[in-house]
Amino acid sequence: MGNNVVVLGTQWGDEGKGKIVDLLTERAKYVVRYQGGHNAGHTLVINGEKTVLHLIPSGILRENVISIIGNGVVLSPSALMKEMQELEDRGIPVRERLLLSEACPLILDYHVALDNAREKARGAKAIGTTGRGIGPAYEDKVARRGLRVGDLFDKATFAEKLKEVMEYHNFQLVNFYKVDAVDYQKVLDDVMAIADILTGMVVDVSDLLDQARKRGDFVMFEGAQGTLLDIDHGTYPYVTSSNTTAGGVATGSGLGPRYVDYVLGIIKAYSTRVGAGPFPTELFDETGEFLCKQGNEYGATTGRRRRTGWLDSVAIRRAVQINSLSGFCLTKLDVLDGLKEVKICVAYRMPDGREVTTTPLAADDWQGIEPIYETMPGWSESTFGVKDRSGLPAAALNYIKRIEELTGVPIDIISTGPDRTETMILRDPFDA
């Protein structure tokens, strides 16, 4: 039996993690975000009602679940308050269900200004960030000048620290990027207005998780973005600024690494990517348009159209290695309904003609890579909403089996629609 279960993306994000976390938290006592910020976009559909969460863990809709934002998350006070208000307007008592680590770095207005100024300065070489200040906030954390939630307990000292760090960043904004400075007093006033709300939710997360482990409570760790966007293991520099892999759980929450019991990798039945960066199986034809339209592939956070392509088992195998995956959840299988044939990338052909079955690390090394495909028959029958494996077409079952063979990991959950009920749980992670 696994008490501590990690749910993370195995591709470039947007795999459908939010729905699965929401589904599995029916048995959990706690749900923990351990990295990223409000650049995530987790969409839940419950009884036909759609909820998009960016910062608050997906377990917040569950009455008996406590949601926790761990120290690995960069926290925007304004984004958090906006999301809390939207949920409270729907009658969800967020403040009774949400806890924060005092070590969460804060994202403030100058981080957003820096993020956007840098992307503009990069021009054609822009990374494609969400423009929400995530990267600059992590930079401040590593440079040891960042402000954290815990700093808000001493408001006078916070004001002094804020002034010092803003002088540093405003100098850069004005003199290097040639944009307006960010107003110190406005930033201070905005944060002070909600400081007591934030500090009122602070808890020692590491100790809480250790006590939960000793009691045998079920805990879900919710990843954001995807493995191939990891700052170390992704397609650098076209990556996010945090560790999106299973290793980020320990550093981003304070859970001891030996206590992770099961790692569930969410894998979309095809591939998507938002923003710039390598994407060997990207499709520019009518099939790519079909996947985008049928899958409604537009970012929950930015609204940007996602790039689409065939499933890449080479990249997925890298995710298996890095995360020591216990099992997969296959999502959006129904999007492939109606295609005469489906393809899976099984290897890459390098510019010099070599065939390889592992991914490069640096983005430049991906240039000129050609995907080598295995083609399989598609299916005309609908898989949408199917809740039993026996109800799936034979061709769809063969597709599932081939993914398992190529990756060496069992598919324990199959999602056939956006609602939490449109799911087959073949093996429950908490029982594995």
From Swiss-Prot:
Chief place of localization: cytoplasm
Keyword Amino-acid biosynthesis attached: no
Annotated positions binding Mg(2+): D14, G41
Molecular function GO labels: adenylosuccinate synthase activity; GTP binding; magnesium ion binding
Biological process terms in GO annotation: 'de novo' AMP biosynthetic process; IMP metabolic process
GO cellular component: cytoplasm
Active site: D14 (proton acceptor), H42 (proton donor)
Subcellular location: Cytoplasm
Catalytic activity: IMP + L-aspartate + GTP = N(6)-(1,2-dicarboxyethyl)-AMP + GDP + phosphate + 2 H(+)
Positions bound to substrate: A300, T301, T302, G303, R304, R305, R306
Sorted UniProt keywords: Cytoplasm, GTP-binding, Ligase, Magnesium, Metal-binding, Nucleotide-binding, Purine biosynthesis
Cofactor note: Binds 1 Mg(2+) ion per subunit.
UniProt EC number: 6.3.4.4
Cofactor(s) recorded in Swiss-Prot or TrEMBL: Mg(2+)
Binding site for GTP: 13-19, 41-43, 306, 332-334, 415-417
Pfam family, one: Adenylsucc_synt
Annotated positions binding IMP: D14, E15, G16, K17, N39, A40, G41, H42, T130, R144, Q225, T240, R304
Pathway: Purine metabolism; AMP biosynthesis via de novo pathway; AMP from IMP: step 1/2
Stated family: Belongs to the adenylosuccinate synthetase family.
Task performed by this protein: Plays an important role in the de novo pathway of purine nucleotide biosynthesis. Catalyzes the first committed step in the biosynthesis of AMP from IMP.
Subunit structure: Homodimer.
This protein's name: Adenylosuccinate synthetase
Lineage: Bacteria, Pseudomonadati, Pseudomonadota, Gammaproteobacteria, Enterobacterales
Gene assigned in the entry: purA
